[in-house]
Amino acid sequence: MGFEMSPMIGLASSGEGFSSLNLISLLGIGLLLLLTWCLGSARSKVNWRLVVTGLLLQIAIAALLFNSQSWTFPAARPEISSVAKLTELVEQVPEISGQVEQYIQKVAASDSMPARSWAEWRQSLEGSPEALADADRLIAAQPPVLPRFPRGILFYGVEQFFSLIRNCVEAGTSFVFRLNPGPEDKHDPLLLLKAFTFGVIPTVIFFGALMSVLYYLGVMRWVVQGMAWVMQRLLGTSGAESLAAAANVLIGQTEAPLVIKPFVGSMTRSELNCLMLGGFATISGSLMAVFASLGVSAGHLLTASIISAPAALVIAKILQPETERPLTLGSVEMPRNNEAVNVIDAAAQGASDGMRLAINVIAMLIAFLALIALVDAVLWGIGELVQGLVNSVSSSESRVDYHWTIKGIFSVLFAPLAWLMGIATSECYKSGEILGTKMVVNEFVAYLDLVDVMDQMKADGANAKVQLSERTQVILTYALCGFSNFASIGIQIGGIGALAPERRGDLAQLGLRAMIGGMIACCLTACVAGVLYGVL
């Protein structure tokens, strides 16, 4: 092999570009807005300026955050001086595999080697120490120019933040329980139980304490107040509903109403609907940390939560347009946290709140997973009965499988919705199953299903039973990012109703439609992600 070549080889971006799936996602935005309008209570009263402005705000924020993934700051990577180190990097950061492929092609062309793919090149080196040594010298002589931040500097920063949280949690749990969470085999029931008990739950507790401290120091107040100010000025929404929408991005459906507690009793029906729908369309910061620890992209989770705020306002104002004059039409400030005496007290209160949330998560998962098993058992029994009846009246054994499961039913019912968001037809049934699980069960179980598919693909590669493209994984990450499920209706009626008992009747009337609106808002953010994916 010759080595008379430039010392570095640059790599182009590996964006997928605009495709027909992006167009389907764009169509999905229009159809979801049309569906929402059809479900609305006062269609002639819809403020279309608010709708258009809110949609443009959502797209602008999403485009800014998506485009940040291109801020990768390419640089020479002289530390990648061998095939082994290049292979290790590709396994750690699969996103750069396309760029490594280009690097190999350029190396082959510049050294008069036959053009090979990355997999073929690695296979050709197996069992040949001399060829491997030559390849190592070749890579050392012309190190690849790879991005410092393959997912972009913003996503890198967010993921590093949640990684720091995970490391802090592991430090705490390792000290208290004398073990290190994160077992290699996630499918072993005992190891899975240990991973959940000593990994996920401590994350909720620690993040609760962290958020409480930030709230006490005024950081959260500043962030929420700023987001609310932007939405209020651009969309013309009232101060109370703008604050609630901004608070929902970070603190969740049960805590956000506390931010506007003095105003809940005097809110209009449109504002109440907006308050509830905002809770259904977002998740809390604690759960964001949990899902990131499970392997879901922290950058996409944060982006989804941010752009869901204007999406929730848009859908809420189509479903229940404002026909009254809100009390806080001008502006309203987020109240200060006067409950904690000092930072230590704030951390202690946050840890206690996190523990209550963790217990709620455990109870919720046990109850709903048990109910799913019960429903599946009933459906299986009905299927056995139908199968027997069909076979008894038929001359030949039926080839139709009547053994149904709740996930199988979801896959059929929600597959059209998955397609509408821009998911490839071949992946719509599995995506529909996950979407149905989110709405009927909860987002936690749905994310666990998505993570399980991702883990199987990582372990088995092309041999994995279920294959979901990166585009589909991104779209589902956005679609699942919300509390829009049937159980949350009761949670919100109980939580908000405790703040204003006289409005419990209104909350009960608005609950189901607000939850459906929250699901539509989540799907709307997924459509926006589908439009921008591969373009920015």
Task: Explain the meaning of each model-derived region.
Residues 234-291, 343, 432-516, 520-528:
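Alpha-helical membrane segments and immediately flanking helix-loop junctions
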Residues 28-40, 54-67, 204-213, 282-290, ...:
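Hydrophobic core segments of alpha-helical transmembrane domains in multi-pass membrane transport
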Residues 224-259, 326-346, 388-395, 406-410, ...:
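Juxtamembrane inter-helical linkers in multi-pass membrane proteins
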Residues 306-359:
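Long, contiguous bundles of hydrophobic transmembrane helices that form the permeation core
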Residues 17-29, 199, 405, 481-485:
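Structural signature of hydrophobic alpha-helical transmembrane segments
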Residues 1-20:
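Short, strongly hydrophobic alpha-helical membrane anchors
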Residues 93, 355-460:
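Transmembrane helical segments that form the transport core of multi-pass membrane transport proteins
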Residues 159-233:
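Hydrophobic alpha-helical hairpins/lids featuring a short glycine-rich hinge
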